[in-house]
């Protein structure tokens, strides 16, 4: 489970960086990433 979490977080940070390249609304991307991050954390409990 821990490895999955690390991989997922790495994927989200990479996709976030990619999205920032062509998405002007950075706050929306950040909010989405935080929601996904929180979902992962609660799912791992």
UniProtKB/Swiss-Prot annotation:
Record keyword Translocase present: no
Top-level division of the source organism's lineage: Eukaryota
Function comment: Component of the COP9 signalosome complex (CSN), a complex involved in various cellular and developmental processes such as photomorphogenesis and auxin and jasmonate responses. The CSN complex is an essential regulator of the ubiquitin (Ubl) conjugation pathway by mediating the deneddylation of the cullin subunits of SCF-type E3 ligase complexes, leading to decrease the Ubl ligase activity of SCF. It is involved in repression of photomorphogenesis in darkness by regulating the activity of COP1-containing Ubl ligase complexes.
Localization terms from the record: Cytoplasm; Nucleus
Gene Ontology biological process terms in this record: red, far-red light phototransduction
Organism this protein belongs to: Brassica oleracea
Protein's UniProt name: COP9 signalosome complex subunit 4
Signal sequence extent: none
Record-level GO cellular component terms: COP9 signalosome; cytoplasm
